[in-house]
Amino acid sequence: MDERVATALGEAFPDRSVDRTFGVGPSWNGANETVGVAFADGGRGFCKVAVDGDGTRIARELAVLRYLDAERSIAGPTVLAGDPNASVPYLVTAPAPGGELLGVWEEAGETRREALLRRVGATLATLHAEPFESHGEIVGSDAAGGLDTERAPWPDVLRATIERTREIGTSERLAAHYDAVFDCVEANRERLEGAPAALLHGDVTKPNLFAVDDAGAGSDAHESAAGPDGIVPIDWELAHVGDPARDLVRAEDQLLNGFDSRGPDRYADALYQGYRDRAGGLPPGFAERRPVYEVVRMLGRSGFIDQWTTFLDEPLESLVERADAELRTRLDAV
């Protein structure tokens, strides 16, 4: 067992024996390590530790999960233990109900995939439904059990999230892309400042969503465990209070798109239709601000270009050229 994980589990569960830990799949985030935990009493959980000793991300995720548990607008995994101020900051959660969307997706036909995406869209609309007074970075829980935020104008919060992307990125090969994206945000500050404020997940991907079987939908037990749409988001460490349009653009990109290509229109339409059906429309100003967020999304390629090389099994220089070309195209569209 990793020494940091052992330290965290020993502090979190001093009277509970661990049978073993196990891997949970690859991650492109080098700032944290997450392992599955099998306890000797038969229980299971997932332990996330901050490998650099910085408890900021743990504090953020812990606060959001406690907030969701109190609000119950949508469900998140149950917190078993957590301490962002420990020598090894940690968060331990219970397994989320249902199956990881990545696996469910691979086994589903087109009709069910569209239905799943409508449910994801509805879940995001539910998350975004509660307005916040201002944008900001989440730093913990407040005295009333809500979210403690460092308030700032939305363009500044957006810049801060871009900085976080750079911190967890795995390659500086395309470092100039960050400067280009920062310049784009600054040039469009006035366009961005009018955005509404809502809680954003910040990293909607198939591995970060769990889907409960449709058969349970509509029951009280189903809604308690998995929210009204049977979709449970996990991994909230990148959550922030920002423009719902940004969350939706990122969700479409990470759920459906390739390195420099878009997924099938019918899938994107299903995601947005689910959102519209729940919210009555897309976030205000979505079309106006979307091109800026498309530029920001390029950093999910640029900052992890080495990971994409392995994932796509293509030469690095080839992907660098494609990324440069795609960024220019997106900047021209703003």
Residue ranges: model-predicted function:
Residues 246-280, 294-311:
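Active-site activation/catalytic loop segments of kinase-like enzymes and analogous catalytic loops
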Residues 25-153, 169-175, 194:
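ATP-binding pocket architecture of kinase catalytic cores
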